[in-house]
UniProtKB/Swiss-Prot annotation:
The protein's name in its UniProt record: DNA repair protein KRE29
Self-association and partners: Component of the Smc5-Smc6 complex which consists of KRE29, MMS21, NSE1, NSE3, NSE4, NSE5, SMC5 and SMC6. Interacts with NSE5.
Compositional bias segments (type: Acidic residues): 53-65
Organism of origin: Saccharomyces cerevisiae (strain ATCC 204508 / S288c)
Coiled coil location: none
Gene: KRE29
Example GO molecular function: ATPase inhibitor activity
One GO cellular component, as annotated: Smc5-Smc6 complex
């Protein structure tokens, strides 16, 4: 069998097929050049040539001899010497892997399995852009984390935060409501800036819906709230059998027995600042209708007073106040049954005089009670405008100095629009309030009420 001259300084000769058939060579002679054919895919061929012969690194005999025992040797070839093989043939038969395809899925399937789960890494020279301290810092953090995890805990006690306590109390209060998402508990308990989720809740339990619906189905005569006065002063028999007194009716509404007996907000227990326990309530207009059955002009003062306080506690409840079916026109019909002064006096027996949050809610229901409420609040029977304005400024300074900005916000909302502090740019009290709020807003404060007060006072000063 003939051999091929492998000297790099001589031209290569064309070798006939008969001379290389013993090698089972994949070389195919053509008129254009030699091609390498993959045995696994007859349709894919690759040119057999060196793109840059001058810069090729495999030119020395030492490099060629190092490849003799590698997988690059021709199968079936039994060389007697290093010159029996063409070095070009050794370098071209490098792999049995199929040629890459345009189809990515096909390429992944044809890739050897041992390479699929590996990502090729390359070294980049970032120069001055690479920060050597990053690797040392990461290593220190990993060592510190390992040390913390491996070290024994010195104190097994768990730190209990105020948010943890509030979340636990909220979970207990709403346990009857079924499964509550954890995200709801976090949103409600972590909102501590404005306390918008805390309010007065007269109804704190689920209503007795079936019993109330039974009363509703039996009720054919509407109370005077709905245009008929024939039921006024007389409790229907079917209602009296189920609810002998107003207290029994309130229990059906979902009011606990303690609140039914007191009909007063206990500020020591912070009943005016409780989370909503997501209890179900009966439709507001129907509750008012059933409550009206227990009013009578012939009743003694204690019974009428109990009725009025129950009514005030009910309409101030956040769930009742914000109910979609709540109609304040029904509340006006109840107010007509009492003198305004008597109504305001009963109101202040339930609500603290400094709770301007509920004062503002009451005025949203009964706007025309603003002057009567302010006179009663500042103990001015004669209601002189100059004296009440001085008391209002004094009250403002107290809230402002104590940084009680939430109450200060509702204090402003309660006062404005009355004849004591009217709207418009000519009110000197408004200018004083604006200067005080502007001074505190220039300081570093995170109280959201300050920003709201700035906008409100600017708005009130522009109303003519």
């Amino acid at each position: 069998m003939g051999s091929v001259n492998s000297s790099p300084n001589e031209e290569f000769e064309t070798v006939p097929d008969s001379q290389i058939s013993g090698f089972d060579s994949p070389l195919i002679p053509t008129s254009v050049g030699s091609y390498f054919r993959d045995d696994d895919d007859d349709e894919k061929v690759h040119p057999n040539f060196i793109s840059d012969p001058e810069n090729d690194s495999l030119n020395s005999d030492e490099e060629f001899s190092s490849l003799e025992n590698s997988d690059l040797n021709l199968s079936g070839a039994k060389a007697e010497s290093g010159d029996d093989f063409d070095p070009i043939l050794k370098r071209t038969i490098i792999s049995k892997r199929k040629a890459p395809s345009n189809n990515e899925d096909e390429e992944i399937v044809k890739t050897p399995r041992k390479l699929v789960n590996y990502v090729p890494l390359k070294i980049f020279n970032l120069g001055d852009s690479f920060d050597d301290t990053i690797t040392t810092t990461v290593a220190k953090l990993q060592d510190l984390k390992k040390e913390i995890l491996d070290s024994p805990r010195s104190n097994k006690s768990i730190v209990i935060t105020s948010n943890t306590v509030a979340k636990s109390e909220l979970q207990k209060s709403i346990k009857f409501s079924g499964s509550i998402p954890e995200i709801y508990l976090d949103v409600v308990t972590k909102e501590t800036i404005s306390d918008k989720y805390k309010d007065w809740h007269f109804i704190s339990k689920n209503c007795h819906y079936e019993q109330l619906m039974d009363l509703e189905m039996k009720d054919t005569a509407y109370s005077f709230l709905f245009g008929s006065s024939r039921s006024q002063g007389k409790v229907p028999e079917f209602v009296h059998l189920k609810c002998p007194s107003i207290t029994n009716l309130l229990v059906l509404f979902g009011v606990n027995q303690e609140k039914c007996n007191s009909l007063k907000i206990n500020y020591e227990k912070k009943e005016n600042s409780r989370y909503d326990n997501l209890c179900t309530i009966f439709p507001v207009n129907k509750m008012l209708k059933f409550l009206m059955y227990f009013y009578s002009d012939d009743d003694n003062d204690d019974v009428r007073e109990f009725f009025l306080k129950a009514f005030i506690c009910l309409i101030l409840d956040r769930k009742v106040f914000n109910a979609m079916e709540s109609d304040h026109r029904l509340c006006f019909k109840v107010l007509e049954l009492f003198n305004e002064a008597h109504f305001i006096n009963s109101y202040f027996e339930i609500v603290d005089k400094n709770d301007f949050f509920l004062h503002y809610r009451l005025l949203q229901i009964f706007p025309h009670l603003q002057s009567a409420l302010l006179r009663r609040r500042f103990s001015e029977k004669q209601g002189r405008t100059e004296t009440i304005q001085q008391n209002i400024i004094k009250e403002f300074n107290e809230f402002f100095d104590c940084k009680n900005y939430k109450n200060l916000l509702y204090f402003i909302l309660t006062m404005y629009g009355s004849k004591f502090i009217p709207f418009g740019p000519k009110c000197q009290v408004t200018e004083y309030f604006k200067d005080c709020i502007l001074d505190i807003s220039n300081e570093t404060t995170n109280d959201v009420e300050i920003s709201i007060l700035k906008g409100i006072l600017n708005l009130f000063s522009k109303i003519r």
